[in-house]
UniProtKB/Swiss-Prot annotation:
The keyword Repeat appears for this protein: yes
Organism: Xenopus tropicalis
Protein name, UniProt field: Growth factor receptor-bound protein 2
Main location: nucleus
Domain SH3 per the UniProt entry, residue ranges: 1-58, 168-227
């Protein structure tokens, strides 16, 4: 994930990362600490205070979903090139690109060089976002012409198992207030946190993921996030 720095930050410890307001940081790990993320900037990495940045969620980033789930979701898409990026199951901290082509789903390991740049083949990029944009017009495969295109929203199925109401494209909301869980299965968060919604079939309680945790939360505690931010 990427984040925009809201303020200047000067590191006060060897494991912290300095940055300036407006810098685009690569967030490497959101689960290290409640108040600190691990991030990278200009080939250097370190810890940054979470309240100094604003996350930039992308509709194609699905986080920690299994390879099998990615194949199931993309298998329902009509068009070749429908894709998502997910965190690698076999190599924590790395990413995989899953793309629909024909009746199959192909998986590409997103590689990184010593300077922290991302690439699939030869051309390298400073961010996943740049890599995705490039491969919208340049094939991700050397064997077929496969151009990335955003997945389509699959209409929700009313009734039946709640699992059928999972969103097929990630929708993000931002917390307006702090929410502390009162029951098992509820999702706690702090004001300003970004939440990925995975089920919005209930008018009052939605299911989402935040900082590696999944659970239910009250709809009136959040506000939609612009997909194009």
């Amino acid at each position: 994930m990427e984040a925009v720095a809201k303020y200047d930050f000067k590191a006060t410890a060897d494991d912290e990362l300095s940055f300036k307001r407006g810098d685009i940081l690569k967030v490497l790990n959101e689960e290290c600490d409640q108040n600190w993320y691990k991030a990278e900037l200009n080939g250097k990495d370190g810890f940054i205070p979470k309240n100094y940045i604003e996350m930039k969620p992308h509709p194609w980033f699905f986080g920690k979903i299994p390879r099998a789930k990615a194949e199931e979701m993309l298998g329902k898409q009509r068009h070749d090139g429908a894709f998502l990026i997910r965190e690698s199951e076999s190599a924590p901290g790395d990413f995989s690109l899953s793309v629909k082509f024909g009746n199959d789903v192909q998986h590409f390991k997103v590689l990184r060089d010593g300077a922290g740049k991302y690439f699939l083949w030869v051309v390298k990029f400073n961010s996943l976002n740049e890599l995705v944009d490039y491969h919208r017009s340049t094939s991700v495969s050397r064997n077929q012409q496969i151009f990335l295109r955003d997945i389509e929203q699959v209409p929700q199925v009313h009734g039946g198992d709640r699992a059928t109401n999972l969103l097929q494209q990630p929708t993000y909301v931002q917390a307006l207030f702090d929410f502390d869980p009162q029951e098992d299965g509820e999702l706690g968060f702090r004001r300003g946190d970004f939440i990925q919604v995975v089920d919005n079939s209930d008018p009052n309680w939605w299911k989402g993921t935040c900082l590696g945790q999944t659970g239910m939360f009250p709809r009136n505690y959040v506000t939609p996030v612009n997909r194009n931010m």
